[in-house]
A protein has these predicted regions:
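Phosphate/pyrophosphate-binding catalytic cores of soluble transferases and nucleic-acid-acting enzymes
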Residues: 2-267
Length: 267
């Protein structure tokens, strides 16, 4: 998961509990501080190291998460996206500074509607990256990502998507948000802000961004939880749209444990 690598961001990223970690070994958690950079390239390299070690111990690695690009890059290799000149990067940075991230998202929507649909209008770094690529190459970033998906699969793999009815999924999201609030999510954010500036990229993720707005007095307490729930549901919808285009994945309701286990054994 792209957010669970950050130390101190525990409740809001739904990291495994200490009890769960004691029952089975977990990897690639708490690798960097929120003010450090973590990339898909680093994820692939570190995942490959973990997989090698587990194979030597005759263990089968299980990957869990919802960051589609991370999974695709591990299975099929990193996207061969062309280099972007410093001039174009400066131009996009100027747009973002002068017009704001939502305006940049609108620009992206005009030239790469598919790519824009996958991103939240406030996801500054990914929006800027997508704009840089389309301006530099004349092609949307999604075209490079789709092309790379035709590469040979690098590992034998059985992939499953939890296929819940939409209302059941949304109900679980709403309940999970309430549980995370009860666990002290707001206090977690307060502690993070005591150590780090609020404009860091990880703090733009869903929930953290809204809690920061609440702590700044820009969001009423009565609006906080419903807004996080809404944006999480929207993100889940975008995730499902992404994964529907991944032909190597099987869709199954997680309650069908025997069927899932049987299919895994066949693979």
């Amino acid at each position: 998961d792209s957010m669970q690598v950050y130390r101190g961001m525990d409740i809001g990223t739904a990291k495994p509990t200490e009890c769960e970690r004691n029952r089975v070994s977990h990897h690639l958690f708490d690798l960097v501080n929120p003010d450090e950079t973590y990339s898909v390239g680093r994820f692939v390299r570190e995942s490959e190291e973990v997989i090698k070690k587990l194979k030597l111990r005759k263990k089968i690695p299980i990957l869990v998460g919802g960051t589609g690009m991370y999974l695709r890059s591990l299975l099929f290799g990193l996207s061969q996206i062309p280099e972007v000149s410093s001039n174009i990067k400066l131009q996009v940075k100027k747009w973002q500074k002068e017009e704001g991230t939502p305006a940049c998202w609108q620009k992206l929507k005009e030239v790469d509607p598919e790519g824009a649909e996958k991103l939240h209008p406030n996801d500054t770094s990914r929006i800027m990256r997508a704009l840089e690529v389309v301006i530099s190459s004349g092609q949307p970033i999604s075209s490079f990502q789709h092309n790379d998906n035709s590469n040979a699969q690098r590992y034998p793999f059985y992939g499953m998507i939890c296929d819940r009815p939409r209302q059941e999924l949304y109900d679980r999201i709403n309940q999970k948000t309430l549980e995370m609030m009860d666990q002290g999510w707001i206090d977690e954010v307060r502690k993070l802000l005591a150590r780090y500036p609020e404009n860091l990229k990880p703090f733009q993720s869903i929930g953290y961004r809204e809690i920061i707005q609440f702590l700044r007095g820009e969001l009423e307490s009565s609006d906080l939880v419903p807004l996080i729930q809404q944006r999480t549901r929207q993100y889940a919808k975008r995730q499902l749209t992404w994964f529907r285009k991944e032909n190597h994945l099987v869709w199954s309701h997680p309650d069908k444990k025997e069927q899932i286990l049987k299919e895994c054994m066949v693979c």
